[in-house]
Amino acid sequence: MAQNGSVEQFLDVAVEAAKKAGEIIREGFYKTKHVEHKGMVDLVTETDKACEDFIFNHLKQRFPSHKFIGEETTAACGNFELTDEPTWIVDPLDGTTNFVHGFPFVCVSIGLTIEKKPTVGVVYNPIIDELFTGIDGKGAFLNGKPIKVSSQSELVKALLATEAGTNRDKLVVDATTGRINSLLFKVRSLRMCGSCALNLCGVACGRLDLFYELEFGGPWDVAGGAVIVKEAGGFVFDPSGSEFDLTARRVAATNAHLKDAFIKALNE
């Protein structure tokens, strides 16, 4: 067993942290925001920082020997190292641009890796009060009720989600729009909702059939959602079709029926 408790205890403490951080997000959602730029279109607010500080303090009090990786602390120091030690990977506010604009697709994402494997996942949208949870080998849940990926088996009837990203280099944008243009002829429709973690949870609960994203911020965007998708019966993998790498900033997710066709479509 991992240090300082069982996986169920880890989940309980992560849920506590996510819900309390959610209160901070909910309070800030309806107020004037003080926004900083991390890049041309990549934003950060005082709420991001306050939530990360709270979550890390909450987790460190309970699990002082564990390791911690967070979006805002990594942005400040510029690097991170994922080891075999139990490691909490946190995005305190996934969907910051949505938060700034008052678009209610925002969440806290908390993932725990043990021996580099995503093991516990918590994704909480405090604006609409949806809590997604998962433990490796023990199922996935939305507000305590079991969830499963969709049973859709036809790509042409599938709902796809992706994101445009924050890189505005012309070659990158052209590649992004070219890929989207190709996929639009193969699926029913496309959504860009602005949160990698919630897109993964959308696949997990069957609202979305397909999701992929390239060059997102880091492992904090996917560490929680990846567990939840897998425990809902889905597959998480690299868009090339190779094995998912938590640190590679590339992800795709779908159900068993669509996986092969989705990989083919992504690489045509």
From Swiss-Prot:
InterPro entries hit by this protein: IMPase (IPR033942), Inositol_monoP_metal-BS (IPR020583), Inositol_monoPase_Li-sen (IPR020552), Inositol_monophosphatase-like (IPR000760), Inositol_monophosphatase_CS (IPR020550)
Keyword check for Signal: no
Its EC number(s): 3.1.3.25
One biological process term in Gene Ontology: signal transduction
Residues annotated for Mg(2+) 2 binding in this entry: 91, 94, 221
Gene Ontology MF annotations: inositol monophosphate 1-phosphatase activity; inositol monophosphate phosphatase activity; magnesium ion binding
Reported induction: Up-regulated by light and down-regulated by Li(+).
Pathway(s): Polyol metabolism; myo-inositol biosynthesis; myo-inositol from D-glucose 6-phosphate: step 2/2
Source taxon at top rank: Eukaryota
Keywords: Hydrolase, Lithium, Magnesium, Metal-binding
Residues binding Mg(2+) 1: 71, 91, 93
Catalytic activity: a myo-inositol phosphate + H2O = myo-inositol + phosphate
Binding residues for substrate: 71, 93-96, 194-196, 213, 221
Function: Responsible for the provision of inositol required for synthesis of phosphatidylinositol and polyphosphoinositides.
UniProt record similarity statement: Belongs to the inositol monophosphatase superfamily.
Protein name, UniProt field: Inositol monophosphatase 3
Organism field: Solanum lycopersicum (Tomato)
Top-level taxonomy: Eukaryota, Viridiplantae, Streptophyta, Embryophyta, Tracheophyta
Gene: IMP3
